[in-house]
Amino acid sequence: MKWTRRDVVLGLPTLMAFNLIGCTAKTNAATNDETATTTETDKKASGATQITAAEILDGYAFTSTAADENAILVNTADEVTISNSTVDKTGDSDGGDDSNFYGKNAAVLVEGGSTTTLTNLTVTSDAKGANGIFSYGGNGGHNGGEGDGTKVIIKDSIITTTGDGSGGTMTTGGGITNASNLTVTTNGQSSAAIRTDRGGGTVYVDGGTYTSNGLGSPAIYSTAEIHVANAALVSNLSEGVCIEGLNSIELTDCDLTANNTKCNGNATFMDTIMIYQSMSGDAASGNSTFAMTGGSLTSKNGHMFHVTNTNADIELNGVKLTNEDTANVLISVCDDGWNGGNNKATFNAKAQDLAGAVLVGNNSTLALNLTEGSTLEGYVDGNIVNAANQTVSTEVGTVTITLDTNSTWTLTADSHVTEFTGTAANVIANGHTLYVNGTALTGTN
């Protein structure tokens, strides 16, 4: 028995009394031509405690010490409620796709179309490939595919993970996660506090603190649609957030702080908001979207925004920006360690103060639009070196700048753009020159 009721004599409750199956793995063998569907995933997953029907459980201690086993596996289309309980997971996974895409070895795995509500849980994972709470929507890892309705609602809970490949909350395969007032801390590599992977899904977060401490472990990693409000997001080694491919992150009244001091994998830049496409198949190609309204964004090291190998839409509205890096780069759009896509970004600033260098590589494109009284204090250039001090570009690419009548740009160095739309008087030269297609703009202040 791998679970106990904490307020009764050990051994009195029985597994079958709660429609639970203890430590029983599925025995059906998958045929060779099966693709990764919910059925196939069921055959891969096993749980120390398996819940296969509607349940309401309160005040239990769930544990798993075995490799490749969930402490709790919910596999039902029914509603399940677990509250005031602890979940402890040890036992390393062999890793790979089963852990990252389908929830093998997670502390809690929910699949099969269930709506599972988790309240006041303490979840501790100390193993490799052991995500904290995993919502798998059953679409077999098909990016853009609909899920089966699996939804995890988790609130007022603590999640701590230690091993590599162990996110706090994990959503894949079209799953849905609704989280509120969580305290999530991850310590391993590739262990985002709010994590998603192949097949995507939808994530809503309201309130709480989400901290990542490992390499390649941003506070949020998006291969999904993610909305976060009223939360504190902290990354102490990696990017603050990463968006891969045709996916999105929306932050509302959040405080995001990142101190990216080490490159991971193919990356050759350090940054706080990284938007890219790896071409690994984990995310469909298309426009990546990052939107932030209110709150604060603090970049302690590297570029504040970095776009590479994808098309990105960035929107800021009334965000307090703090760039503590001495180079003071607001955004770089350029080549990095991936190829096969474009380096192209549209940056919309609304009622927003911006500061820093705008770096656009020779084969890259940026449209920067300032509206509703936004300000930019900075310059545009194409001379770019990466974190290894290697030259990436020596000439500026295609840059268009648009200022509405209430927005201004104060130059901090000579700047070169392809196109300028707005009133020249809204450009404060500050002793410098703005060149538009090689011609100095006249009429600046």
Residue map of PLM features:
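Post-signal peptide N-terminal segment of mature Sec-exported envelope proteins
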Residues: 31-43
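Bacterial lipoprotein signal-peptidase II cleavage site
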Residues: 23-32
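Feature marking well-ordered beta-strand scaffolds used for ligand recognition
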Residues: 96-99
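Surface-exposed loop/turn positions within long extracellular repeat scaffolds
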Residues: 395-401, 411-421, 435-436, 441
